[in-house]
Amino acid sequence: MAKIYIVGTPIGNLSDITLRALETLKKVDYIACEDTRVSKILLNHYQINKPLFSYHKFNEKSKLNYIFELVESGSDVALISDSGMPVISDPGFLLIREAKKKNIDLEVIPGVSAFSMAFVKSSFPLPFSFLGFLNDKTGKRKNELKKLSAGISYISYVSKYKLIQTLKDLKEVFGLNVEVFLTRELTKKFENDYTGTIDEIIDQLGESIKGEFTLIFFIKQA
């Protein structure tokens, strides 16, 4: 039987793709993309011309049977995100879970993840916990933060629209008992890191906040 490949792709710099990922994308019959327009940038760069179809959080349930029919008819299918590893704050969990129930072969082709790269840069200690995206609502977000344990480094992806308020929430909940490291646009031209107190980081960000951010914070023992 054919199989489903879960393929990691670059998070910014197209040169970060692995040889194995390229080999896989070149040999499969179909590629499921979070956004076909975004994926075409990578695929065109490496002259990969395969049938594409969208697979994202708004259609992942409805596309499951289509993917399974392709595989059961003998076609290999690769799943890729706009950037990084599928499943990590991106679609893929449901596909993998349901494929296992059907005993469909799965193979993961590893790639870059922003959270692991950011953690390495942070110099914060193990253990760490990846939170994905915190709640969009300030009240619920603060409740999430209050449940976290001290002595652990936490990693979160943060929208530029929620960044300042999230930093303020950290300060309100933890006061001086939190260390913060913020990085933006990892592997891209304007990659930049922000360190210091929360107030200092907010000042460094200024009024024009652009790009994709990864936030790491370490809760110190009170």
Swiss-Prot record:
Pfam families: TP_methylase (PF00590). Coiled coil: none annotated. GO terms for cellular component: cytoplasm. It is an enzyme of class 2 (transferase). SUPFAM superfamilies: Tetrapyrrole methylase (SSF53790). Transmembrane segments: none annotated. It is found in: Cytoplasm. PANTHER family: RIBOSOMAL RNA SMALL SUBUNIT METHYLTRANSFERASE I. Belongs to the methyltransferase superfamily. RsmI family. Catalyzes the 2'-O-methylation of the ribose of cytidine 1402 (C1402) in 16S rRNA. This is Ribosomal RNA small subunit methyltransferase I.
